[in-house]
Amino acid sequence: MLDAFSRVVVNSDTKAAYVGGSDLQALKKFIADGNKRLDSVNAIVSNASCVVSDAVSGMICENPGLITPGGNCYTNRRMAACLRDGEIIIRYVSYALLSGDPSVLEDRCLNGLKETYIALGVPTNSNARAVDIMKASVVALINNTATLRKMPTPSGDCSALAAEAGSYFDRVNSALS
């Protein structure tokens, strides 16, 4: 896992060059947007349970067969596993947003995710839909357009951070397809 700083150092070191130019400007921007980034992550983690439960509820509303006998959310154990998986995904998205680097998400969450779901017989299309709903909720939280939220959200223009968070959810969906 690399954060924004480590990534720049590693890239410069492989080129046997000093940190400078566009890498330095990117780090300056990362630092300048630090409070917005922290506020965005705080908004995500403070609302994570609601975001995940809303996403799973939305997925089930669109596919009621998931909660009928034989469905992948039928029985409390399977529903709990579904909610747990959503919590894990959103947690790793928040880690990636905090560090400004998707490697923690890729390495610790997405690596082998599709194969695991296939082996367990979990429909990836339903998971992808839940991820889309989580993405929409998180982007709304970061952009301060969400309603009925638990706490204040980041102030100022956070569209770049919202897009970054959205890209991490897109990575999750790519890993599932």
Swiss-Prot record:
GO terms for biological process: photosynthesis. (2R,3E)-phycoerythrobilin 2 binds at residue 158. Contains two covalently linked phycoerythrobilin chromophores and one covalently linked phycourobilin chromophore. Phycourobilin binds at residues 50, 61. Disulfide bonds: none annotated. The modification N4-methylasparagine is found at residue 72. It comes from the Eukaryota. The keyword Thylakoid applies. It is found in: Plastid, Chloroplast thylakoid membrane. It is a peripheral membrane protein. SUPFAM superfamilies: Globin-like. This is B-phycoerythrin beta chain.
